[in-house]
Every structure is written in structure tokens, then in C-alpha cells.
Amino acid sequence: NDVAMEVETAAEEEEVDDRLSRKAVEDYGEFDPTLELRNFKFPTIELLKDHNANGGGITIDHEELEENKNKIVDTLKNYKIDIAQIKATVGPTVTLYEIIPEAGIRISKIKSLEDDIALSLSALGIRIIAPIPGKGTIGIEVPNKNATMVSMRSVIASPRFQNAEMELPMALGKTISNETFVVDLAKMPHLLMAGATGQGKSVGLNAILTSLLYSKHPAEVKFILVDPKKVELTLFNKIERHYLAKLPDTEDAIITDNTKVINTLNSLCIEMDNRYELLKDAMVRNIKEYNAKFKARKLNPENGHKFLPYIVLVVDEFADLIMTAGKEVEAPIARLAQLARAIGIHLIIATQRPSVNVITGIIKANFPARIAFRVTSKIDSRTILDSQGADQLIGKGDMLFTQGNTLLRLQCAFVDTPEVDRITEFIGSQKAYADAYHLPEYSGEESGTSLDIDVNDRDNLFREAAEVIVIAQQGSASLLQRKLKLG
């Protein structure tokens, strides 16, 4: 069969839409959201102080280590617990002693000796981790006599933070092994911070905001700052036209008035719904894909598409909001916590004690990432972390961080008010947008009665009742019942 056969297939048709976007990218390059403020300079590292006199290194006191090791070994020996080997990891404020007990010793026995070990070391805030997840050891954390301060500068200058391939990198501080700890807020997706007064919550918030200012251009992230204390976040007023978001007709970008919070939260819910509509039109699943598609000029701005910045909502004292506004705040916060993660709205909520009447179960379930500073009792620690341990911290920025699985002990980076002031001054002095980022309009029901009452629709006995009250010069339900022979 020698007849030659010619095979022909039709070429795939090129998608028109794609060609247009490719041509636009070839002609103009990818869309650059930072174009409007292209000369924006990020704050320099020089604006932060180095709080350590000795150049930021950790001073290792070998005598102290040896002494503590001997005390731990002796205490455990008294209770007939032999140790195969022991290893110390020195951190900024805490040293971790990892011990491997001899075979056949029950862990629960060591765990029950927590107070005895604390007594023999005469130290405050000892925590026993038995066993350390991922290692076959038991950890005993002992505070150092001379703690090293972790400055914000050392954390931000670290390669971990500078080379972080993250959407919203937050440098929280240093771990026990003195490594800088950087975590992505976009992956969390929301963060709950709690701890007693004066243990470093507001400093922690400042550290988070500072690390975002050091890593993100104003076009990429916007903050909504809610500050019922009125004084904690006022420094960030200077960067209003760069980084803050607010309702269109309000004066201050930082919300201190609790009634305005309700409008802002509801407006944020509208923003969330609008963003989901845009994502639905663009046929993408999250803000990262959406912005990538928009940068590649595949979405037409005439259809309402625009570059979407991340929005971070920071609430400094959540309990105060719940007391004054209650249910009206709870509903939008719960909605945002459940739904807002895919479209780049993230919540950071700080409160003294996240008990059920402050943070309901629904909201709490959507905050897998928790930070606990020192609290006074085991019950408080359980409320925050669902496990104990936060009651044994030292205070002053010593904290436990969890993302739903293991607890990690960190020393929070310290950032002082003058430093924040210098950073905001540096950013605020540069060319800015015309105004803060505007959230959608939301007009709540005007305060007053929300019942539908018609004034003409009066009771038959209204006039008599009015006369009785005027004559008696006082009014009560029982008085009207007696005089008008009702009920």
C-alpha cells in the first residue's frame, strides 16, 4: 500500500484576550502599583537604636550555666531520676537545658517536679517542656540572670527578615536559640495577642507595624488602626496619607471613638464583599493570584478591576470595644475573621484576657495564631493558648507564640516610642497620596429609636394617662394601672 497520505491538523486558535494582554505588557511593561510613589524611600535601619552596649551579641556566663546544670542534675538525682546527657542552648533571656533521661523513667515524673527544680535554682518562670516536639529530649527553660535586650534593629537587619519571601513578613523577635523569628501574617491569617497589663502587648503591636513598614510599599498594604486607649497608636497619624485607610468623611484616620468603629467594621465588610465580586469576575481564588493577573494586564480597569492592597486591621484593646458596643462589633468581626483571609484583609486583635464574654468561640476559632505575654494564672493561660505555660513567663516581652500546633517561646523585639516617631516622621515627610485609602461608604442607622412607630397611632387612653402623670408629677406603670383601672 504505497499511497502517500498527507496529515493535516488545524492550528490551535490563539486566544484574543491573551494576545491583547501580552501586547500591553510588551508595550508598557507589567502594571506597577508603586508607580504613583515611585520615589518612595523605605525607612533606613539607622532610624532604629541598637539597645545593646556590647554590640548585640549574647554574653554567655559559663559559671551560671555550670551551676544551673549541677543543680538540675542534683535535684533530679534526689528523686531517683538519672540523666544520660544534658545540653544547654543559650538565648537572649532564657536558656534551654535539654536532658535525655535514662531508659525506663516516666516523663510525667519529671513534669511533676517543676516546682522543686524552680526551688533549687531559685529562679522565676521555669517551664518544663516534656517532651520537646520533634526531638527525643525533655526541655527545662531557665531565665538568664542577665538578660540581653532584643532590639528591633538587630531583628530587622537580619538576613531572615531582609530575604523573606513572604507577603506580609512580621519580625516578632528572637527564639530561644537566638535566631530571628519571622512569620507571614498572610498565612496566619489573623493574630490574637493577649497578656496582663504592662507585659509588652503594645510594644509587640509596634514591632509588628514597624516590620511591615520596613518591608512593604504604601501601595501594597494599608492599616486600619483602632485605638480605644487613645494614646498607643497616635504616632502613626503622620503616615496617614501613605499607609492608613479610613472612611471617606472622617477627620482622623486612627479611630479612637467606639461608635465610629462599628461603621468602619461594617464598611470593611462591604469592602470584603466587593473584593470577592472582583475575584469572582477575574476567576481567581485569592488576592495573590488576582494581583498577579492584574499586573500582567489581563484584567480591564474599565470593569472595576484595580490593584488590591492588603488591609491590616489592628485593634489595641478589644475588651473595651465589646463593653461599649457589644453585639454590633462582634457580628462584623466574626464575618471578617471567617471570610476575609482570601482577599487580603487580616485582623490583629490585642486584649488583656480573651475570655468568652470578650471573644466568642466563633471568633476565637478563626484565630489559630496566638501570642501570649505573661498572665497571672494558669486559667488565663488556658484561655489564650488552650494550654498552660503563659503564667510561667518572666514578663517584659517574654512571650509564647503558637500557630495551632506547637508552642514557641520568643523574646519580643523592643521598639521604643522615639524610634517609632522617627520612622513615621521619615515616611511622613515624603511625597504622599492625596488622601488616606478610602473604604466604601457605610451609613449606619442613625442613633435614636429603631422601632417603626407612627406618632398619630396613639392609644385611646393616651390623653387621660398624660393628665394623670402631670397631676401626680411622677409616672410609673403601677400608678397608671391604679388610676385608669387597667390590668
Where is each model-derived feature located?
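Conserved alpha/beta core segments of nucleic-acid transaction machinery
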Residues: T402-G487
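Conserved helix/coil segment N-terminal to the catalytic DExD/H
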Residues: K295-N300
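Low-complexity, intrinsically disordered P/S/T-rich segments
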Residues: N1-H190, S381
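Short, charged, solvent-exposed linker or helix-capping segments at domain edges/interfaces
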Residues: V150-S154, A194-G195, D421-E425
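Short glycine-rich substrate-engagement loop in P-loop NTPases that contacts/grips substrate
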Residues: V284-F294
